[in-house]
Amino acid sequence: MSKFHLHIVTPKGTYRDVDVDILNIRTTDGQMGILAHHMPLASGVEIAEMNYRIDKDRYEFAVGGGFVYVDGDNTVTLIVNDIESPEEIDLRRAEEAKARAEERLRSKNPNVDLQRAEVALKKAITRIHVKNNY
């Protein structure tokens, strides 16, 4: 299978710079599998699980939203707010974040930012799922 170059960037800098066979990612346009020589594309990235394959190895991640750009030169740039592999995820911290977000969503306090709480809950659930399943 042909490979393409994947460059993953976070606010902290380069996270990964690898040649991969396929990138599976949830965009604002739906779930996508990006292969080598994919047509040019720019899309938002949802808070969700993401994976890529190198030969027979599959690498899983929790992604906190962002942007993906596929150029015409067989390079994909993924700019994300945050990204964690299962090894990097602190399960206790993710479960605590989930509980806090759920509490804020149940709150009757008019000062609670519900949209922010929903985003925090989605991120926590994604992190927990990636940690528990991979």
Describe each region flagged by the PLM:
Residues 10-96, 100:
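Compact, glycine-rich, soluble single-domain proteins
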